[in-house]
């Protein structure tokens, strides 16, 4: 299942709902428009990268600005809009929390970068390998993990990455990156109290 993200900014991109499914190379990107919907896809593989829904407010009420909180009902409405405009393809979404409490089980130095560490982080349902550059990260900590598909307050989408040759699946967050009030200026991840439960959603 693709990581679905939906964006809406009435002032920035007019009355358009942006539905992203996956990245494709810019050179191969092309469009197929039917009615108020444009399908964005790869001209070589025919893989769908997303949909742009124009005149969105005539179909659905959107109260979010920026990244839209997805619910089952909202995704059903998106699929209804696609069908109404002649597209048979359906969007499927993962509704599990994207920001969760993690436990740093192990930390080892990155073999190719002095300031990076390779962390083994348990998040309840799975164990992730995350490359982290924070100076204060250490084994035994409870931290906030942004999973693949999470959208940071800055608008940055968390994607699978490779840092200096080492795969990284997610990000260990600082208070500043989460835009928490009174976040410290100095660099460093947010270390949580031990009372937080591993795997639980982190709300902010």
Where are these regions (language model features)?
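Phosphate-backbone binding interfaces of nucleic-acid-interacting proteins
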Residues: 1-204
């Amino acid at each position: 299942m693709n990581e679905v993200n939906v964006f809406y900014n009435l002032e920035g991109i007019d009355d358009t709902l942006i539905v992203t499914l996956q990245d494709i190379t810019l050179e191969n990107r092309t469009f197929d428009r039917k009615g108020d919907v444009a399908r964005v896809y790869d001209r070589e593989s025919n893989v769908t990268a997303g949909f742009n829904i124009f005149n969105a407010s005539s179909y659905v009420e959107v109260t979010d600005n920026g990244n839209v909180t997805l619910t089952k009902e909202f995704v059903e409405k998106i699929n209804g809009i696609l069908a109404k405009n002649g597209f048979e393809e359906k969007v499927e979404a993962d509704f599990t929390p994207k920001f969760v409490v993690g436990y740093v089980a192990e930390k080892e130095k990155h073999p190719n970068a002095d300031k990076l560490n390779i962390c083994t982080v348990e998040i309840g349902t799975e164990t992730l390998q995350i490359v982290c550059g924070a100076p204060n990260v250490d084994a035994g900590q409870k931290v906030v993990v942004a999973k693949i598909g999470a959208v940071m307050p800055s608008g940055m989408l968390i994607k699978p990455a490779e840092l200096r040759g080492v795969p990284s699946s997610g990000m260990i967050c600082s208070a500043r990156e989460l835009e928490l009030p009174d976040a410290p200026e100095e660099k460093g991840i947010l270390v949580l109290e031990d009372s937080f439960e591993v795997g639980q959603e982190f709300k902010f």
